[in-house]
Amino acid sequence: AGQQFQYDDSGNTFFYQMAEVFEKEQSIXAAXE
């Protein structure tokens, strides 16, 4: 999902990538728990 937004004009790509990683980490943590 994050790869669909590729405009480093204002660094939005970085934000989307961080959000995607954050969701994945939360999912992993939830599965682990």
From Swiss-Prot:
Keywords: Chaperone, Endoplasmic reticulum, Membrane, Protein transport, Transmembrane, Transport. Its main location: endoplasmic reticulum. GO terms for biological process: post-translational protein targeting to membrane, translocation. It is found in: Endoplasmic reticulum membrane. It comes from the Eukaryota. Pancreas. The keyword Heme does not apply. It is a multi-pass membrane protein. GO terms for cellular component: endoplasmic reticulum membrane. Mediates cotranslational and post-translational transport of certain precursor polypeptides across endoplasmic reticulum (ER). Proposed to play an auxiliary role in recognition of precursors with short and apolar signal peptides. May cooperate with SEC62 and HSPA5/BiP to facilitate targeting of small presecretory proteins into the SEC61 channel-forming translocon complex, triggering channel opening for polypeptide translocation to the ER lumen. Required for efficient PKD1/Polycystin-1 biogenesis and trafficking to the plasma membrane of the primary cilia. The ER translocon complex consists of channel-forming core components SEC61A1, SEC61B and SEC61G and different auxiliary components such as SEC62 and SEC63. This is Translocation protein SEC63 homolog.
